[in-house]
């Protein structure tokens, strides 16, 4: 499933743009976190380096909602200018803070959760770090309800739009501020002229509908066009793009069918919850379908890997069930997913595909380092 590093591939591997995309899904972020822990462990093993981190291998890391939080955790520098969190630290983060984030602190007429604990823990963990300090290019989405436009936070856009150099904790809260669940987030930055620039942001899934893979790939394409290191890459040259997309599991609500008679009895809240669940699941499916088709049409199908569990049941479908029992189930979902085949047509498991992915990422990193030394 993953491109082998033989033949002519090695000649251009060093110029390949590598992209990691992480879906939104609340507490279900435990599933991609489990996958990331496995991948980072493989990179450490392949390179015989226990300090290897995901940010060392990906040119672009993008995420929305809980995926944006994961993106920040693995790209925000500590005092040694290394990622403040290893992949193995993410699942424990959810276990420690999830029950406090998803508590019953909301009101009947407002969001389900007040978001105060979430913002507090993000401030504590991410400090005053801003976008420009991220250890690799990031793509974190949100949506401004005042301007009615998506807002995409990336390093490469700061020269043109310095007001986007926001604090990472503001960005993380904003991308996670799912309507119904958390309040919108207001904060202020400044333009190049020193003028105040206001943000009124909600969940990034409003902009990317849960799956930020297309957004992340778009940022990577622009990066390839602007960076001399990727001078041989032409627009839409997917042979030189390597995309790993991690899902948070499809929702059983998407698989369930309803009759007009049944839905006619729903109130506004039931409709809102159902529409959000259905839209996210449907969009995730269509994004994967589109990317699979495009990569295949350009004879680059082995450069795209979507890791997704399509059979969530029970409490694991809920984005806000942070009970210890459910979080344990989500870890099991991620671990079991690694053993499942990538597709019905291939016996290769996700674990095997990710091992080869790790080897490819390692080889590409070494080739680029060798090229830079000349």
UniProtKB/Swiss-Prot annotation:
Residues 20-217 form the PNPLA domain. SUPFAM superfamilies: FabD/lysophospholipase-like. The keyword Glycoprotein applies. It comes from the Eukaryota. The keyword Coiled coil applies. A motif (GXGXXG) lies at residues 24-29. A motif (GXSXG) lies at residues 63-67. The nitrogen atoms of the two glycine residues in the GGXR motif define the oxyanion hole, and stabilize the oxyanion that forms during the nucleophilic attack by the catalytic serine during substrate cleavage. This is Patatin-2-Kuras 1. It comes from Solanum tuberosum. The lineage of its organism: Eukaryota, Viridiplantae, Streptophyta, Embryophyta, Tracheophyta.
């Amino acid at each position: 499933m993953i491109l082998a590093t033989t033949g002519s591939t090695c000649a251009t591997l060093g110029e390949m743009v590598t992209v990691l995309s992480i879906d939104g899904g609340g507490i279900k972020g435990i599933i991609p976190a489990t996958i990331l822990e496995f991948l980072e462990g493989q990179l450490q093993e392949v390179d015989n380096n226990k300090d290897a981190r995901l940010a060392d291998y990906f040119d672009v890391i993008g995420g929305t909602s809980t995926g944006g939080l994961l993106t920040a955790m693995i790209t925000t520098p500590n005092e040694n200018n290394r990622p403040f969190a290893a992949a193995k630290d993410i699942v424990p983060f959810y276990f420690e803070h999830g029950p406090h984030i998803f508590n019953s602190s909301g009101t009947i007429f407002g969001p389900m959760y007040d978001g105060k604990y979430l913002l507090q823990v993000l401030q504590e963990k991410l400090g005053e770090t801003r976008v420009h300090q991220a250890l690799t290019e990031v793509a974190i989405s949100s949506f401004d309800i005042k301007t009615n436009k998506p807002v995409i936070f990336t390093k490469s856009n700061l020269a043109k739009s310095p007001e986007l150099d926001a604090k990472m904790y503001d960005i993380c809260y904003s991308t996670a501020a799912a309507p119904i669940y958390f309040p919108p987030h207001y904060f202020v930055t400044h333009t190049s002229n020193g003028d105040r620039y206001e943000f009124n942001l909600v969940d990034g899934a409003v902009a990317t509908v849960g799956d930020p893979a297309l957004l992340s790939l778009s940022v990577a394409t622009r990066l390839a066009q602007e960076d001399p290191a990727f001078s041989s890459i032409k627009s839409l040259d997917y042979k030189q793009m390597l995309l790993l997309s991690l899902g948070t599991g499809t929702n059983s609500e998407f698989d369930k069918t309803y009759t007009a008679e049944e839905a006619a009895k729903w109130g506004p809240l039931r409709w809102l919850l159902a529409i959000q669940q259905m839209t996210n699941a449907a969009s995730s499916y269509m994004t994967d379908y589109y990317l699979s088709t495009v990569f295949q049409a350009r004879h680059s199908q082995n450069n795209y890997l979507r890791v997704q569990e399509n059979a969530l049941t029970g409490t694991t479908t809920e984005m806000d069930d942070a009970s210890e029992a459910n979080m344990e189930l989500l870890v099991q979902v991620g671990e079991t997913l690694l053993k499942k085949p990538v597709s019905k047509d291939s016996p290769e498991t996700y674990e095997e595909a990710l091992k080869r992915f790790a080897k490819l990422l390692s080889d590409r990193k070494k080739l680029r380092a060798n090229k830079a030394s000349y």
